[in-house]
């Protein structure tokens, strides 16, 4: 691929701070990482709904959804996984610049890839949420039957079976969905956002 050097970044006349002021909340990336079936997407979508109910601008970037469009040309090799996360990191950065709280739900198995996304954002704009649900619990859920296929050898390079998952060393938030209900997990994330002054919230949505 030939890369062009004849490009220039064009600054907007509206700053990120001005967008945040208009929205009455800070923008940040909530990066949900964990094994398939750990509960990343479920929690991320529930948090988004809770934020929406309190008039907080937010959006979920889901791992499966992104592979329908932007990342449809990527597979699951180490190189493709790295590019997958790089692209999502760049999209998430644009969402943050737009003043939106951005929730990403990706296995993102490699620590270095997640760290690159963090480094590409401001210090307080990346919150790593480790959904630390045990492998056996994830396998018991296995709604998509992916673990079963991986165990039978029908899928190769599957994270947690024959491909590694590098757990975060010092995540901002750790959640084990095998030990608490969804409402508690959502409240845990909302509490973090409120306590660190990203948003002003009343309570989590328990519907």
Curated annotation (Swiss-Prot):
Function: Catalyzes the synthesis of activated sulfate.
Keyword Phosphoprotein recorded: yes
Gene: cysC
BP-aspect Gene Ontology terms: hydrogen sulfide biosynthetic process; sulfate assimilation
Keywords, comma-separated and alphabetical: ATP-binding, Kinase, Nucleotide-binding, Phosphoprotein, Transferase
Recorded catalytic activity of this chain's protein: adenosine 5'-phosphosulfate + ATP = 3'-phosphoadenylyl sulfate + ADP + H(+)
Family annotation (PANTHER family): BIFUNCTIONAL 3'-PHOSPHOADENOSINE 5'-PHOSPHOSULFATE SYNTHASE, PAPS SYNTHETASE, ISOFORM D
Residues annotated for ATP binding in this entry: 34-41
E.C. number(s) listed in UniProt: 2.7.1.25
One GO MF term: adenylylsulfate kinase activity
Similarity annotation: Belongs to the APS kinase family.
Pfam families: APS_kinase
Active site, UniProt feature: 108 (phosphoserine intermediate)
Record has Phosphoprotein as a keyword: yes
Native source organism of the sequence: Lactiplantibacillus plantarum (strain ATCC BAA-793 / NCIMB 8826 / WCFS1) (Lactobacillus plantarum)
HAMAP family reported for this sequence: Adenylyl_sulf_kinase
SUPFAM superfamilies for this protein: P-loop containing nucleoside triphosphate hydrolases
Annotated protein name in UniProt: Adenylyl-sulfate kinase
Pathway: Sulfur metabolism; hydrogen sulfide biosynthesis; sulfite from sulfate: step 2/3
